[in-house]
Amino acid sequence: MAAQRATLEVVDELVHEVRPGMTERQLAARAEELAWAHGATGVWTPIAVGAGPGALVCHPAFPPTDRAVNDPDLVWFDVTPEFAGWPGDATRSVVVGDDAGRERLLADARRIQHAIVDACEPGMPGNELFAVARRLFDAYGYELLDLLGNIGHDLGRGGVVTGFIDPRNGTPMWGCWAIEPHIGLDGVAAKFEDLVWLGEDGAVVLA
């Protein structure tokens, strides 16, 4: 809980600091700097930043570049610090400048994220939650951009990932899961991510 709380503080600070002209690489370095200031001991997977066309791909194989934030733009930050073995994982998106289309995508992405999180139930199969997400994407008219075709993964101590939320995974979901649908349309993308604990007492968003 404390690790995720600190992670959310880091990503929220980034959302308020981003400006046109800053590069993905600069923003990733700033994310690490903020994470250390919040007590992080490392990162369990590389921090990712997406700006402009770079926001269409979120994967460790595509690290932050010298691509600069435009005006207008839609930028996301996927922040992944570790605190003495406990991982944090959060993504937030923000519109830079004034653009109604990007603002609409941002609002829809947030609504979709909230709806998927609200649908989480302890022990539900991963592919059932994916089906919920797929219906939302179709209803809102967006594409799923994740390169592996999933909307999230489990997350254990040390950043261990053993399963994904995709059409093929019928394993019951228990423990900590990252819910992170990466969606877009017409060359613009947005992403939100939260950690949800699925236990005997129900589903709890870690914050």
PLM region spans:
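Active-site neighborhoods and metal-handling regions in enzymes and metal-associated proteins
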Residues: M1-A207
